[in-house]
Curated annotation (Swiss-Prot):
Molecular functions (GO terms): ATP binding; hydrolase activity
InterPro entries associated with the record: Actin, Actin/actin-like_CS, Actin_CS, ATPase_NBD
Protein name stated in the entry: Actin-3
Annotated Gene3D superfamilies: 3.30.420.40, Actin, Chain A, domain 4
Organism annotation: Oryza sativa subsp. indica (Rice)
Reactions accelerated catalytically: ATP + H2O = ADP + phosphate + H(+)
Amino acid sequence: MADGEDIQPLVCDNGTGMVKAGFAGDDAPRAVFPSIVGRPRHTGVMVGMGQKDAYVGDEAQSKRGILTLKYPIEHGIVNNWDDMEKIWHHTFYNELRVAPEEHPILLTEAPLNPKANREKMTQIMFETFNAPAMYVAIQAVLSLYASGRTTGIVLDSGDGVTHTVPIYEGYALPHAILRLDLAGRDLTDCLMKILTERGYSFTTTAEREIVRDIKEKLAYIALDYEQELETAKSSSSVEKSYELPDGQVITIGAERFRCPEVLFQPSLIGMEAPGIHETTYNSIMKCDVDIRKDLYGNIVLSGGTTMFPGIADRMSKEITALAPSSMKIKVVAPPERKYSVWIGGSILASLSTFQQMWISKGEYDESGPSIVHRKCF
């Protein structure tokens, strides 16, 4: 390897549902695997099978039938540090096959992440993994970078949490950031419930993954929900079939758009919250009147839960209805938006101007974990 190459920074975007990890400068993450740690439900009886006390990611996924699955990140925020450490260990050693002590590491965090969380992340990187340098960046800001903008409002919706983050000339405006605890996992739960009402039983953590797959493959967002419901009642044009792992085939119709409609109408699952369109609008309205025009014209979608077909048109329609009538509204849905946080991180970590931003091991040893608040905005 060339001299310059072995110090390629690592970029690790830890989401509630998936970990996206790889090398700065690459155009896509090398490793994408579920943020799951699984522990055996039964004690092993076969000797020499090399059973482990914990499985991470895809391996946990494939053995899900015999494991209890745990998600160390909930609503975008880490709540189980031991498991999180296992995930990071797996990321560096098994997925990327690198020695973390040789690479600067860029991590991502949810907007409005508690301060203590940020410090704990920093501490683990330096003390457990001996990183030479690290940095923590806000996810939505990275998505905006990836779209080639410095001003706009990002609607970032993943598996565990949705945020609207207005950014002006590269600065996130914290007073106007809004968080909505409604995201992909809730939609999966909602679909599980709808399917259960129809007589299919999906209950275990393993079966939830099947429902997630159905959602990702078949769900879409209706431009006009009521109209679509009428269509679904009167014709079979929206029906699609899906084959379960055991060969059973199920047909889903109106569920295809009933499930993601929750993003616009959280009341459908009994949540007292504004929909994503209203949250975006409220977020814009919390900003200075002079910059609103720039935000309305740069609404950037990011995260896996914005991958539903039809979301950009519907978003555009709903925001047009809320905004002043002469306002030009543009909703941008980049095709790679599932990974745009990671891509933004890859761009940021490879900028020459960013190199002085890293927190070095030396600075950490001198100041302790609180250094992260001074160096990372």
